[in-house]
Amino acid sequence: MIATLRYEFRMQIRKRSVWIVPALTLVLFVLIGGSLLRDLFDPAERPPEARLAVVGLALQIHALLAIGFGCLLADRLVRDDRLRVAPILDATPASPARRLAGKYLGAGTATAVPIAVAYFGFATAYAVSSGSWSALLWALAAFGTVFLPGLLFVAAFALTVPLLMPAPLFRVLFAGYWLWGNVVTPDLMPTLSGTVIHPLGGYPMAALFDFAGIDGQDQWAGPIPGAALNFLRPDPTPLVAWLSIALLLVLAAAALTCGHLMRLAERTRS
């Protein structure tokens, strides 16, 4: 698994698109209009607390860059079949399960590197400009509890769902899912936003960081009066936040397991 992880990491980190896609996304977002990415460096506009600034930054960058993250990973698993190297890999000592785990962790980590660079870069710049060095500790905590579970969830489905459909179709559907299930508010239409299976990290933000938006008026977790799927929106508590993280990881493991079984079944038929 380690050898596969290293190989996949090196292959993915060298792809220009892994760096260009998040860079262009951030540049375009900043140029479109005012946002926290710009306000962080304006003493009159930036949030008064380092915690609010860093968690708000995590929310914006996660919401923006996770779409590209999933799309960039969509062809990593099916590529072996397309290039007809799967039979060669099957002849190596590494088991298919270990190779899948190595590909998942290696390619996923490499694709997440630019996201981490962007996030910690902005957090460091904020800490320097504001003098609030506690922002770096908040950034580490937010990355581990908000970013990582969501990215692991997205990576698992981005690798395995293209086994069932063409990668371009998955990218289109995934972009639609991400906007519907994470950005659309529950009072507009039925959505998974604000539920315990919300990969944007609503429950960790609300329960672990007491985050309700920069102005304190947003609700990222918990029941919404009149909204559908409120049975998936218990009141946000630290216990429920950790349960939400665990559910995302369990779903990621389930997706990988299903992908592994599908590939084994395909090998058996062939």
PLM region spans:
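Transmembrane alpha-helical core residues of multi-pass small-molecule transporters
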Residues: 24-28, 106, 176-181
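Terminal transmembrane helical anchor/hairpin motif
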Residues: 38-44, 48, 172-270
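Hydrophobic core positions of alpha-helical segments in small-molecule transporters
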Residues: 21-23, 101-102, 173
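Aromatic- and glycine-rich beta-strand/loop motifs that create alpha-glucan
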Residues: 1-25, 266-269
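Secretory targeting signals
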Residues: 27-75, 101-169
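Transmembrane alpha-helical segments in integral membrane proteins
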Residues: 67-81, 154-168, 240-266
